[in-house]
């Protein structure tokens, strides 16, 4: 197994983890139903880009 040769300092450990932070999800309000949804996704009502594309699940 691989074993570190030297102890990694707290500073270097934290610098290594600097890109692991979670970012907030980008949600938008659907203009047809008024519910929150992810961009470029079909809403729960089955609408995409103002048109009904699937049957409603709610």
Curated annotation (Swiss-Prot):
Superkingdom to which the source organism belongs: Bacteria
Record's signal peptide: none
GO terms under cellular component: large ribosomal subunit
GO biological process terms held by the UniProt record: translation
GO MF assignments: structural constituent of ribosome
Entry-linked Pfam families: Ribosomal_L32p
InterPro entries: Ribosomal_bL32 (IPR002677), Ribosomal_bL32_bact (IPR044957), Ribosomal_zn-bd (IPR011332)
Matching SUPFAM superfamilies: Zn-binding ribosomal proteins
Alphabetically ordered keywords of this record: Ribonucleoprotein, Ribosomal protein
Family according to the record: Belongs to the bacterial ribosomal protein bL32 family.
NCBIfam families assigned: rpmF_bact (TIGR01031)
Official protein name in the record: Large ribosomal subunit protein bL32
Organism ancestry: Bacteria, Pseudomonadati, Pseudomonadota, Alphaproteobacteria, Rickettsiales
